[in-house]
Regions:
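Extreme N-terminal segment that seeds HTH/winged-HTH DNA-binding domains in transcriptional regulators
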Residues: 1-47
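A short, conserved structural fragment
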Residues: 61-69
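Basic, amphipathic "hinge/linker" alpha-helix immediately C-terminal to the N-terminal HTH DNA-binding motif
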Residues: 72-91
Length: 239
């Protein structure tokens, strides 16, 4: 048995397979850590048929990794949550290592990490993290769980929610779409960047953003994939 599979073992159970780890990670992400995920949301995220997802959900519930209540969605149990966080740690450390140590662009690290996360042992991932200075976030701003399973679950504001005149610092960008990441990179909408909403066109028109002397316009659908920490002096939400 490989070290990676040995370390993915839940006490009293067989080692978790890559598909099971993918399910747990998806449910954690959809439910924002502690909330519920609908089976159709899981199916959409994993690009699977809803019937296949329903069957797997029942099996994982029988294994004690999920709590499932009809019409109320799926939640991770404590053991399921721990397993999801182990997988997320491997994924996000690998992303950070690829970017910092190997110079990968931020739009390519997600797919590489998806392939590597199930094969890498926890020891290898810990060494990767140490080599690049124990990063707290991945290249897209997502928090990296610690070795003991703790993680920053702060809920941030979507850029699409900021009102005209509000400022914020970009903290996280959705990482699933490489083309979107490349485009945001070209616009310099990156974690750590301070931006101000200059104007909003009506009827879901473009949002004009300013950063220093630089201005760009993006649509609200794209802005919804960017999370910001509003700056208290001028921050606000659309209401």
């Amino acid at each position: 048995m490989s070290a990676a599979r040995e370390e993915s073992r839940v006490p009293g159970r067989e080692p978790l397979t890559a598909p099971v780890e993918d399910y747990l990670k998806a449910i954690y992400t959809i439910g924002k850590g502690t909330g519920a995920a609908a089976t159709n949301e899981i199916a959409q995220r994993l690009a699977l048929a809803p019937a296949s997802v329903s069957g797997m959900v029942r099996r994982l519930a029988d294994q004690g990794l999920l709590a499932y209540e009809r019409y109320h969605g799926v939640k991770l149990t404590e053991s399921g949550r721990r397993a999801a966080l182990r997988t997320l740690r491997r994924h996000r450390v690998i992303e950070a290592y690829l970017a910092k140590a190997l110079g990968y662009p931020w739009d390519r690290v997600h797919e590489e990490a998806e392939r590597l996360e199930h094969a890498a042992s926890d020891e290898l991932v810990d060494r990767m993290a140490a080599t690049i200075g124990e990063p707290e976030v991945d290249p897209h701003g997502a928090p990296i769980p610690t070795k003991d399973g703790s993680v920053d679950e702060t809920v941030y504001t979507s850029l699409a929610e900021l009102v005209v005149g509000a400022s914020g610092v970009v903290v996280r960008v959705a990482d699933e779409d490489p083309e979107m990441l490349r485009y945001l990179g070209e616009l310099s909408i990156l974690p750590g960047k301070r931006i101000t909403v200059k104007s909003r066109a009506p009827y879901d028109g473009p949002i004009t953003l300013g950063s220093g002397r630089h201005e760009v316009s993006i649509g609200p659908a794209l802005a919804a994939h960017v999370l910001v920490a509003p700056l208290a002096d001028r921050a606000g939400k659309r209401g």
